[in-house]
Regions:
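Short hydrophobic beta-strand element within catalytic cores of glycosyltransferases
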Residues: 303, 307-310
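N-terminal subdomain of nucleotide-sugar transferases
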Residues: 1-64, 242
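A charged, aromatic-enriched C-terminal amphipathic alpha-helix characteristic of glycosyltransferases
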Residues: 37, 343-382
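Active-site proximal beta-strand in glycosyltransferases
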Residues: 106-108, 121-144, 159, 166
Length: 447
């Protein structure tokens, strides 16, 4: 029997099925939410590398930009206020999603505060026991949290349920570890240190310009949020002092509603327009940050051929260790004068920035590394031995040609106390058993 002749539209493969749990903080416009942007880029790049992945995304509503051919979206209403969202875990709805009909080889969670609850429901009320890993782009570290009560302890206890949790920078990891030391013992800190792994948010290789603009306008760009945690007032003070010395430059702040100085411009446009405008800029300014996260604004500029002067701290050295750094306002003004006065030096630094992006910060390379780790987790997942019951399941599939997971569970008559995950792993390790490239898993026997 040749099953390819029976189901010609079905692609048989060793599918890796991933449940993805979100961290949504900007429901007002989901397409602009940082999590949505990251997961969209991750899935897109992972799909470029291989075609045997299926993602189950939990979302507050359907998201058009995430309608990939290998994505199933499940709507779970969520509170919009971040502290409330992080306290709300919808057990009944999550149990519905963790259906007897589905398989999950991995769980990728972006919200540590819910990870223990998710694992608790999954392991104790379903047949599933996959390994957990994930990514966290926001940490409730002191001096950054805007609300009265943070969720830092819940974040740490959740992260301890991960095999690995990616975060933006080593600086961010150090902040988390140092604050955790005030609550947790040494053994826990050692475990936490092993789980947390920096993963830099690189860029699409196609977005890096081939060559720099060698005759840019004398524009200093501050394309970060003009907020306190980005030290915007301090940046303006630097520009005020520079403007007293010279008046041959402008400052572009695209995220500022309106100019607050006569040398400022705040023009705005879509993403394509924004990139074109960056290419006209002379130099960028990356300020001190209270949080020490990854600066997408800086990589936006660098990939468009803009050299940046950056505050001298580890989170910017991770971003471009070959760049120019300032420790104080005086040094910042000196550097800005150097760039504005020496176009040859400016162009050399711009070319170095592009080379750095191409060699160090292509996001697809980061996704390839993550994919290797995902494969490792799948391989390490426990598989049953060649038991009589497992042989029965293989024979059922062979005789029927194909069976769904639900069909198999019903034949077995198992309750939730018997775990299916080790049997799925053994089936996927079997040389003749294949899954399909669809939302609902089916097990085929291929001769």
């Amino acid at each position: 029997m040749n099953l390819f002749e029976i189901d010609k539209e079905v692609k048989l493969q060793k599918t890796v099925r991933v449940l993805v749990y979100p961290n949504i903080t900007f429901q007002e416009d989901l397409e602009k939410d940082s999590y949505i942007q990251v997961i969209k880029k991750q899935i897109s790049l992972l799909n470029e590398i291989r075609d045997d992945l299926w993602f189950y995304l939990i979302l507050p509503c359907s998201v058009p930009s995430l309608q990939f051919t290998n994505v199933t979206q499940y709507v779970v209403p969520m509170p919009t206020y971040p502290p409330t969202m992080r306290s709300h875990f919808d057990v009944p709805r999550i149990k519905e999603i963790l259906s007897r009909e589905l398989d999950f080889d991995l769980v990728m969670t972006h919200l540590p505060e819910h990870t223990h609850a998710l694992k608790n429901v999954m392991y104790n009320t379903t047949h599933h026991e996959p390994k957990f890993f994930g990514y966290c782009h926001w940490w409730d570290v002191k001096d950054v949290v805007a609300w009265s009560k943070d969720s830092f302890i819940q974040q740490i206890t959740g992260v301890l349920e991960y095999e690995r949790c990616y975060l933006n920078t080593q600086h961010q990891k150090d902040l988390v570890i140092n604050q955790a030391k005030k609550t947790f013992n040494d053994d826990t800190i050692i475990k936490l240190n092993d789980i947390l792994v920096p993963q830099h948010l690189g860029v699409d290789e196609k977005d890096i310009v081939d060559k720099i603009n060698e005759t840019p306008e004398k524009i200093i760009v501050f394309n970060h949020r003009p907020d306190t945690y980005k030290h915007f007032k301090e940046f303006v003070a630097v520009c005020d002092e520079l403007y007293e010395i010279r008046q041959d430059f402008k400052v572009w702040v695209p995220l500022l509603p309106n100019p607050t100085r006569k040398y400022m411009v705040t023009t705005k446009g879509n993403k394509e327009w924004y990139y074109k405008e960056l290419q006209k800029c002379y130099v960028g300014f990356s300020p001190k940050q209270s949080y020490g996260g990854w600066s997408v604004s800086t990589t936006d500029g660098m990939m468009n051929g803009v050299p940046y002067i950056m505050y001298d701290d580890t989170y910017y050295h991770e971003l471009n260790e070959m760049g120019d750094f300032f420790e104080d306002d005086h040094t910042a003004i000196q550097l800005l004068n150097t760039y504005l006065d020496d176009p040859e030096y400016r162009n050399e630094e711009a070319s170095k920035a592009i080379d750095w992006m191409k060699n160090k910060l292509v996001y697809k390379d980061k996704m390839l590394e993550m994919l290797f780790y995902m494969d490792r987790l799948v391989i390490e997942t426990r598989a049953v031995k060649d038991t009589d019951r497992f042989k029965d399941i293989v024979e059922w599939i062979k005789t029927a040609g194909k069976l769904s997971k639900k069909d198999i569970i019903e034949r077995l008559g198992w309750g939730r106390g018997i775990k299916w995950t080790p049997y799925r792993r053994a089936l996927m390790n079997h040389p003749n058993i294949y899954d399909v490239n669809g939302s609902t898993p089916y097990y085929y026997y291929k001769y």
